[in-house]
Amino acid sequence: MNLENLAPIALFVYNRPYHTKKTIEYLSRNIYAQNSDLFIFSDYPKTYLESDKVNEVRNYCSDIKKFKSIKVILRDKNLGLAKNIVDGISYILKKNEKIIVLEDDLLTDKYFLKYINEALNKFEDNKDVISIHGYIYPLKKKFDKPSFLKGAD
C-alpha cells in the first residue's frame, strides 16, 4: 500500500464531546492514522443553548495529534447536518479523487483505514462499486471474507 496515496478523512462533528472524543480516540489507533490527512468540519450551533457543547468539541478538535495533518473547519453559521456534509465532501473532492467520510459517533477498528484505503484502490476503476463501507448490516449468514451487498446504497 502506497502510504502517500491515502484517502483524506472527513469527520463531521457538532455538539457531542463524548462521542467526538471516542471517535477520534479509536480513529487515531488505526495503523494508517499517522499517514492520513484529517479534515474536521464543525457546524455552528443552531441555538445559544448548544454553544457550550459545540465549543467543547471545537476546543478538543484544536488539540488533536496523531495524524499526518489536521485541518479543522469551523462553520460560522449553522448549515445543518446535510449541507455541512455535502459542502465538506465537495471541499475535499475539489483536490482529491477519493474520501473517507465519518460522523462523530463511529468507533473504528484499528484496521479500518487500511481496509477502506485498500478497497478504494482495488475498486477505483470498477463502475459497479460506488462506495466502500465499514459497516455491515446484521446478517444471519456468516461470511469468511468481505463481500458485496448489492443495493446497499
Predicted feature descriptions by range:
Residues M1-V101, L106-D153:
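An acidic/histidine-cluster motif and surrounding catalytic segment
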